[in-house]
Regions:
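Recognition helices and adjacent regulatory flanks at domain boundaries
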Residues: 1-11, 18, 47-48, 117-119
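Short, solvent-exposed amphipathic helices
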Residues: 93-111
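Basic, amphipathic "hinge/linker" alpha-helix immediately C-terminal to the N-terminal HTH DNA-binding motif
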Residues: 77-98
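Basic amphipathic alpha-helical segments that dock to polyanions
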Residues: 57, 61-64
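N-terminal helix-turn-helix DNA-binding core of bacterial DNA-binding proteins
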Residues: 13-56, 75-77, 82-84
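Short, charged recognition helix plus adjacent turn
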Residues: 111-123
Length: 123
């Protein structure tokens, strides 16, 4: 396979697609939930990630599985079918970065909220 030189600012660079995927609304929450709980079933993930629809959670998990960030294990011998999700080593390598973003958001929540209010009042 030809090695690609990443350039996040180039429209055709696959690294841009990866960054966009990581920034999607439910991706960070699903990865965070799997990091905290280690192994989860679909319904457990849906309960933890409040507000996610079944369709969006399914799409998010499929993307993460496709990209190798999540491992999906199906237990076909179980009735009803049992499916579990966990982070792959690649997914685990993303956790520290997402934890930093989470910490930054929590640390700056009040200031950003105040800025939003001031902005809206200035209109």
């Amino acid at each position: 396979m030809k090695e690609l030189k990443p350039d996040i600012y180039a429209a055709a660079c696959p690294s841009r697609e990866i960054l966009i995927m990581i920034g999607e609304k439910w991706v960070c929450l699903v990865i965070g939930a799997l990091d905290a709980q280690k192994i989860l079933r679909f319904g457990e993930l849906k309960r933890i990630c409040e507000g996610v629809s079944q369709k969006m959670l399914t799409q998010t998990l499929r993307k993460l599985e496709r990209d190798g960030l999540v491992i999906r294990t199906v237990y076909a011998d179980k009735v009803p079918l049992k499916v579990e999700y966990k982070l792959s080593p690649l997914g685990k390598s993303l956790v520290p970065v997402l934890q930093q973003v989470k910490s930054w958001a929590e640390m700056n929540l009040s200031e950003i909220n105040d800025n939003r209010i001031a902005f809206e009042q200035s209109k």
